[in-house]
Amino acid sequence: MNYSALITLAQKLIQQPSVSPNHHSCHEIIANYLEKLNFNVELMRFDNTLNLWAFHSCKKQQKHTTLLFIGHTDVVDPGDPQFWDYPPFSGLVHNNMLHGRGAIDMKGALAAMLVATANFIDQYPNYQGRIAFLITSDEEGSGINGTTKVVESLIARNEHINYCIVGEPSSQDQLGDVIKNGRRGSLTGQLTIHGSQGHVAYPQFSKNPIHLIIPALSDLLNITWDREKSILFPPTAIQITNIYSNHKNNNVTPHTVILNFNVRFNDKCSIDNIKRYINDIFTRHTLPYNINWKLSAEPYFSKPGQLTNVAINAIKYYQKFEPRLETTGGTSDGRFIAKMGTEVIELGARNHMIHKVNEYIDLIDLKLLSSIYKKIIEDLILIQ
């Protein structure tokens, strides 16, 4: 394994300030890398988002087992650089750590996938199979013009993907200790409670919507969402993310109060039931309200199969332990590929520094991740 090339590529990607949905030359870097490996590379632009679809096979006339790697080049905003020990887009290596925004989520994994693939093709130039990449710059943002649009195009072309590895940071305490094979759904709501504005010294002449909402919040947080326990996912849960009014004077009660919340839901709690439970509470409290809903993702679950078994064995080979299969955490682009009937796993770096100031990846983990990816390719493609 060419580890110096791995570190150099990861640094080059991290040094691009690709805050979502801007890829900021990352896709050109990756396209050039893949073209040197004789990949067929296609750049797909949808509105403000650039996506990359690429594939490589040795024998074009045969139907091949296809292994797809999915990743994203966009990152979340690093915030004020003064809070970072090193510039967030420096890609600096210090004390065996590669520093920078995206080191974990997920430019490190992208570099690991690419170098693993390059080493595999170099070692097995006449392999029978197909390796593909789908890379977007719109995963951390809206996701509207990213992976989902590319998948729609692939379905229209009758592309068949057997296996898919998403490079999201799935690991927790040790690299490879967790493989994700599904995620809960995500439903966001913005609730507006209507009152009437007035002077704080004369509450009898106004209806303070902040006071009105307080009794209902306790009921909201104590909803029994799941009528039976899911064997695939964690329980459905709600989190209130913001409560605010647009009024700034301390001697005036506001006309409205706005509450933002998010529900992560499993297969035992439907979207319709979530809306009904929440509407029932505010109706029961006789509050004048309206809710704007946004569905970000429905739950997805990928039944463990050949890819999962191969990944488990690859991790056991290098780490000497067996990983856990989980469906915890946030949403991922794996849900779009799962619609194609593809076996999907998420396997990547440790997630302890995801979206945090001073994000970094241990170089030992980066090298190990690339080695695990390469062994998965070998065991899936060569042993058919």
From Swiss-Prot:
Zn(2+) 1 binds at H72, D105, E168. GO terms for biological process: diaminopimelate biosynthetic process; L-arginine biosynthetic process; lysine biosynthetic process via diaminopimelate. Keywords: Amino-acid biosynthesis, Cobalt, Diaminopimelate biosynthesis, Hydrolase, Lysine biosynthesis, Metal-binding, Zinc. One of its GO terms (molecular function) is zinc ion binding. Its EC number is 3.5.1.18. The active site is at D74, E139 (proton acceptor). The keyword Zinc applies. Pathway: Amino-acid biosynthesis; L-lysine biosynthesis via DAP pathway; LL-2,6-diaminopimelate from (S)-tetrahydrodipicolinate (succinylase route): step 3/3. Zn(2+) 2 binds at D105, E140, H355. Binds 2 Zn(2+) or Co(2+) ions per subunit. Its cofactor is Zn(2+); Co(2+). Signal peptide: none annotated. It catalyses: N-succinyl-(2S,6S)-2,6-diaminopimelate + H2O = (2S,6S)-2,6-diaminopimelate + succinate. Catalyzes the hydrolysis of N-succinyl-L,L-diaminopimelic acid (SDAP), forming succinate and LL-2,6-diaminopimelate (DAP), an intermediate involved in the bacterial biosynthesis of lysine and meso-diaminopimelic acid, an essential component of bacterial cell walls. Belongs to the peptidase M20A family. DapE subfamily. PANTHER family: ACETYLORNITHINE DEACETYLASE, N-ACETYL-L-CITRULLINE DEACETYLASE. Homodimer. NCBIfam families: dapE_proteo (TIGR01246), PRK13009.1 (NF009557). This is Succinyl-diaminopimelate desuccinylase.
